[in-house]
Amino acid sequence: MVLCVVPGERTAAKVVAVVEDVRRRTGGRLMDLITTDGYPAYEGAIPGAYGETITPPRTGERGRPRSPYKVAPEGLTYAVVEKAREKGRVVSIATRVVFGTVAAVAAALGMSRVSTAINTSFLERQNGTDRHRNARKARKTYRFSKDWRYHEAVTYLTLYAYNFCWPVRTSGVKNDRGRRQPQSPAMAAGLADHVWTMAEWCSMPAVRRC
C-alpha cells in the first residue's frame, strides 16, 4: 500500500517529509521492519520522526548550552540495501542493519509472508507499476510532463488510486471455488470490500461527516 506521496526530486527535505507523513498516517506506530536503499538522509530522518527528544541538562558553566537531540526509540528496526554500480550496472548488493539487531531483523522477516531477506523489491516493483500507470514517467517518450502542476496532480492521482483501484494478484485470497481472487491493497488492509472503479474513487468524499 502506498502510504505517502511527495513528488519531486529526492532531497533530504523530501525524505524528512515522507517519513514524517508516514509516521502521522500510521499513528506513530513503529513498523516491525523498515528498509530503504542507501540514501543517507534516511538515517537521520527516521529517528528524527520516531525518536525521543533529549534535552541535555545545564552544567552551570559558561558557554552555550548543548542543543536538544533525538535518539532512536527502543524497538526501532531499520536496515538498508546498498548497491554498487559500475557503468550503470549493479555489480554487488550489501545489506546493513542501522537500528536494532540482526536478531530483530530476522524475527521481523520470519513473520513476513513474502520476504525472507532485507530488500527493497516492493518499492522497486511499485516504481515499475507507477511508470506503467502514469505515462508521464515512462522512459524515452514524448509524453513527459511539460507543466509541473499537471505532473504533480497525476502523480497523486495514480499512486493513491492504486491503493483502491488496482487488483494485486499476489495479495489475493481463495474464493469458494478455490480460485485466487485478487485484492486491492485497500482490501488487504481492511479498508475496502471490493476493487473500486476510478469513478468510485474520484467521487468518494475525502472526508465523511457523520
Predicted region positions:
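Residue-level recognition of single "structural anchor" positions
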Residues: 1-210
